[in-house]
């Protein structure tokens, strides 16, 4: 890598199934990885020798299903006992265990059993995206803007920020995916300055968001947002997989439910069929020797695929109705409906949406896979003062809190302090009091959600306000102050007004939340893994170099014309040195140094022999 540090910040779309990275240097560029792909699978694989990230990890998933991790975004910031986690675990080939209420992934790596938090797995993908950018820019990248689903809660946002820290990035801002896509759309060619209401429909591999924005000049104001952090292409694949599984069982009497390799191969075939059906109306699915020597073959029509996923497709319209209702805007007032996310290529999804908007033409001018990273890179340039163009220098983003924030009151009633769709950053206050006479401590449990009963919302954390002067119940005035920053992350303070006593928390004691010590430890571990990866690559390279040199010398020695020019003694010496080099290649865990020494030794003998011909 060239010297120096990149002054700007890269934009990373950290996706459930694929990730994408962009940079801004006078204009936005989506950066391709070493395979030439502009999106990289969010996969990490562990083997007895090495760690693989991206395409290399996904390509070997069928051979190593138990140690190939994906869908980390469906675990990040969640509790182990959450229903979605429990359901997903039934479909994942890798093992997820409960560590103090948080889900942790367990794999075999370098011959040992290792545990990784979802933040660590995500950090490995982020590191890969950072390296892809560095290879293109030729400088070290230190700063990034990372995107999350608009509907991510506080815990999921903080955990994503932590993943960035573990990967060694300074995360300048966490921004919402649909908002980032709106920037890409708003800066697109031929867009006028006229005011417009734009609905962003973002259906990706694992998450779904709908955001309604008002765009005027360079000001992007999010009016409302809704979604489902557990709906996307993976779910359509799962429904297809179940259909194919029962089809195979019907035809052969064989059940592949417990065979991780067969399931991975069939899922890959299902994903391919789904993609194909976006452009044709019928396809054939074939998997040779799927299980017990039996081949799998089935034809699938687009209509059948739509039928299998009808309920899920239909459910995408609920958040659309919700954002219109929350923003108090009728559907006829929406100027553009913009499609984002790979799953919006599905014709049925497009038809349902177009029909909902009375046959409206959908806006497909932006690349659904790249728009989010594009917008993040623009925001990165603005935050680092690198945006030079007229259209970006006045750009202002006003986003919202996706879910209401508040405290638990007596009887488990949820007292809302920050209503959902409040523009952030924001500070909101609400006063509370005591429920018992002479009560000197009040506990403040902080929740996020929309239900009246606290138990049905997400508990973000709790803290105590102590040393309240003893008074009659209802007399003390306790003020809760909620501060939400531009990342959508919350800090809460409570103050007793007569004494000024206060207690505060940046929500950090929730299950699975990493302390700064945890993050530091993981950063060091990440460095160790990187060093191990590099050492493995060097060893592999040294071994390959030795192998190819040995092969070329063997060719020389066995070639009658070339070998006849060698003196008898020289030929014997070369053959002896070759035998030593081959012995070095046979060593099970040969080191880089051993391979290098063997290569140098062989070269020395060969050079001497050749020069004395």
Swiss-Prot record:
GO terms for molecular function: ATP binding; ATP hydrolysis activity; ATP-dependent protein folding chaperone. Ribosome-bound, Hsp70-type chaperone that assists in the cotranslational folding of newly synthesized proteins in the cytosol. Stimulates folding by interacting with nascent chains, binding to short, largely hydrophobic sequences exposed by unfolded proteins, thereby stabilizing longer, more slowly translated, and aggregation-prone nascent polypeptides and domains that cannot fold stably until fully synthesized. The Hsp70-protein substrate interaction depends on ATP-binding and on allosteric regulation between the NBD and the SBD. Residues 392-402 are annotated as: Inter-domain linker. It catalyses: ATP + H2O = ADP + phosphate + H(+). Residues 516-612 are annotated as: Lid domain (SBDalpha). This is Ribosome-associated molecular chaperone SSB1. Its main location: cytoplasm. The gene is SSB1. SUPFAM superfamilies: Actin-like ATPase domain, Heat shock protein 70kD (HSP70), C-terminal subdomain, Heat shock protein 70kD (HSP70), peptide-binding domain. Keywords: ATP-binding, Chaperone, Cytoplasm, Hydrolase, Nucleotide-binding, Protein biosynthesis. Binds to ribosomes. Binds close to the ribosomal tunnel exit via contacts with both ribosomal proteins and rRNA. Directly interacts with nascent polypeptides. This interaction is dependent on the ribosome-associated complex (RAC). Interacts with SSE1. Interacts with FES1. InterPro entries: ATPase_NBD (IPR043129), Heat_shock_70_CS (IPR018181), HSP70_C_sf (IPR029048), HSP70_peptide-bd_sf (IPR029047), Hsp_70_fam (IPR013126).
């Amino acid at each position: 890598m060239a010297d120096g540090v990149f002054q700007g910040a890269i934009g990373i779309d950290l996706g459930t199934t694929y990730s994408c990275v962009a940079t801004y240097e006078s204009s936005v560029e989506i950066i391709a990885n070493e395979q030439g792909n502009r999106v990289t699978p969010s996969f990490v694989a562990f083997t007895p020798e090495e760690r693989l990230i991206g395409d290399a990890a996904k390509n070997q998933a069928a051979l190593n299903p138990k140690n190939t991790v994906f869908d980390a975004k469906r675990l990040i910031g969640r509790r182990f006992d959450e229903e979605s986690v429990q359901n997903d675990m039934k479909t994942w080939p890798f093992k997820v265990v409960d560590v103090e209420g948080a889900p942790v992934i367990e794999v075999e790596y370098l011959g040992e059993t290792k545990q990784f938090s979802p933040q660590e797995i995500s950090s490995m993908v982020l590191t890969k995206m950072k390296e892809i950018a560095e290879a293109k820019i030729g400088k070290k990248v230190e700063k990034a803007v990372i995107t999350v689903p608009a509907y991510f809660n506080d815990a999921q946002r903080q955990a994503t920020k932590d993943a960035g820290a573990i990967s060694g990035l300074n995360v300048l801002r966490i921004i919402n995916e649909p908002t980032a896509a709106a920037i890409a759309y708003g800066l697109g060619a031929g867009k006028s300055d006229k005011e417009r209401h734009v609905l962003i429909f973002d259906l990706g591999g694992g998450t779904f968001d709908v955001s309604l924005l008002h765009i005027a000049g360079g000001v992007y104001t999010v009016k409302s947002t809704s979604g489902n952090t557990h709906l996307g292409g993976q779910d359509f694949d799962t429904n297809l997989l179940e259909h194919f599984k029962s089809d195979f069982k019907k035809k052969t009497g064989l059940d592949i439910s417990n065979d991780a390799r067969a399931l991975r191969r069939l899922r890959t075939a299902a994903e391919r069929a789904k993609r194909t059906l976006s452009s044709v109306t019928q396809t054939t699915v074939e998997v040779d020797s799927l299980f017990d020597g039996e081949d799998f073959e089935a034809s699938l029509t687009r209509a059948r695929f739509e039928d299998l996923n009808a309920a899920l497709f239909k459910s995408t319209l609920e958040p659309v109705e919700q954002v219109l209702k929350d923003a108090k805007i009728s559907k006829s007032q929406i100027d553009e409906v913009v499609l984002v996310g790979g799953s919006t290529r599905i014709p049925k999804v497009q038809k349902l949406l177009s029909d909902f908007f009375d046959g409206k033409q959908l806006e497909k001018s932006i690349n659904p896979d790249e728009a989010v990273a594009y917008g993040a890179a623009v925001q990165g340039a603005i935050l680092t003062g690198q945006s030079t163009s007229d259209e970006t220098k006045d750009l202002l983003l006003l986003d919202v809190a996706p879910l209401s924030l508040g405290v638990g009151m007596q009887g488990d009633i949820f007292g809302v302090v920050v209503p959902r769709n409040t523009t952030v950053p924001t500070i909101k206050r609400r006063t509370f009091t005591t429920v018992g006479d002479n009560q000197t401590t009040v506990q403040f449990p902080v929740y996020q959600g929309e239900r009246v009963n606290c138990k049905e919302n997400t508990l973000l954390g709790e803290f105590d306000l102590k040393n309240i002067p003893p008074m009659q119940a209802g007399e003390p005035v306790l003020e809760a102050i909620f501060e939400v920053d531009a990342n959508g992350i919350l800090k809460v303070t409570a103050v007793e007004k007569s004494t000024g006593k206060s207690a505060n928390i940046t929500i950090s004691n929730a299950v699975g939340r990493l302390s700064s010590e945890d993050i530091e430890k993981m950063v060091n571990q990440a460095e160790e893994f990187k060093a191990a990866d590099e050492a493995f690559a060097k060893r592999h390279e040294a071994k390959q170099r030795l192998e190819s040199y040995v092969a070329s010398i063997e060719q020389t020695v066995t070639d009658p014309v070339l070998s006849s020019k060698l003196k008898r003694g020289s030929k014997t010496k070369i053959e002896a040195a070759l035998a030593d080099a081959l012995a070095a290649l046979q060593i099970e865990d040969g080191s880089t140094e051993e391979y290098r020494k063997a290569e140098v030794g062989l070269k020395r003998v060969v050079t001497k022999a050749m020069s004395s011909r």
